[in-house]
Amino acid sequence: MKIAILGPVTTKTYFGGVAVFDEELAAGFKHNEWEVVLITNQKNADSEKNGVPVRMINAISARKIIKEESPDIILASLQYAKYWRFCKENAIRIYFLHGFFNQSYYGKLKSEAASLYQRLIAKQSHYVFANSYFTKMVNDQFFGIQTNEVFHLGVTSEYYSAILNTEVPKEKGAILYTGRLVSAKGIGNLLWAMKVLKDGGMPYKAYIAGDGPDKEKLEKYVAKNNLDVHFLGRVSQKDLVTYYSKAEIFVSLNPSEPFGIVFPEALLARCKIVCPCTGGQVEYLMDYKDTVAFVDEASPDAVANGIERLGKSPVAAELSDKYIQTFRYDTVAKEMIDYLNVRGKNKWTLKN
């Protein structure tokens, strides 16, 4: 069987979570001995990613290229489902939901328009997949988009290999945040929590990896309150592994995180984790309550208490080899293959 994955890919000028998902999932299907192709309208994309061919399309060439590839299954993200009309009639169409368009983050107009588009696409799909039960619930209950199955995401193969083989020791009292520096991500509440801890005689050091529009304001707050916070800006994958490895506690406070790939990254790095009580991460962190603090992310005092509790605990997350494997994309791809084989029953069987 041949699968085409439609969506963005990373380039020298573009990097995004969905692009990474597309490339890693494609490699996962290839590892499971499927024929796979990446199809994108990203300009200046490489001709291959992880050994998977990349076909670049535009409004003129899309029909010709997709017909040439003639995939049996086509999995699309974001607006790329518009190219389904060029697939052969019996191709299986899968739409993958990476989250939801909440008004507080995207604005009322974009949220309503994007959700309407996704509802229309979902009706044209044979299957709709989501990255968490939280994403599934929100899309179903608030946007009228029903999901067939949930598939948790993996980390990149590069990160997976590096983090399991690192020898960087943990730094006592070190906190790590990775992500955009915007209010929706809760970075301000983390810094306010650090002031609470400092005022209580329990100073912590924080490494902030990422950039965003709130950076200048956050830097001024840190300087004014003399907090031990290091703004790293955008960091390379290699450096990110180092910071995850040395961090004792990882903090991320977005209450509406659809999945939160940073949490599996932190878990594999054996970080203790402070996170909200809501979001997709709750589904796979609930089994680690001794090393995870679920907090009211809007309360700096609650965040500070979570950090303090974990900082005093000598316990680190213990992960089984089987559980670690679930964060590999060849495992994610195999789960999708098994799901489709069962749903195909006797009408069609999906084999390599």
Regions found by a protein language model. Name each.
Residues R234-V235, T242-A247:
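Short alpha-helical donor nucleotide-sugar binding micro-motif in glycosyltransferases
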Residues E219-V235:
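Nucleotide-activated donor-binding/catalytic signature segment of Leloir-type glycosyltransferases, i.e.
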Residues P255:
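Aromatic "clamp/platform" in nucleotide-sugar-dependent glycosyltransferases that forms part
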Residues Y106, G154-K172, T242:
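Acidic anion/phosphate-binding donor-loop and adjacent secondary structure
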Residues K136-V155:
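Helix-loop-beta element that forms the nucleotide-linked donor phosphate-binding surface
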Residues Y288-P300, I307-S313:
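Conserved acidic donor-binding segment of nucleotide-sugar-dependent glycosyltransferases
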Residues S111-V128, M137, Q141-F142:
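Membrane-proximal helix-turn-helix segments that form the acceptor-binding/catalytic region
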Residues V20-E24, G173, Y177-V196, P213-E216:
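A conserved mid-protein helix/loop that constitutes part of the nucleotide-sugar donor-binding site
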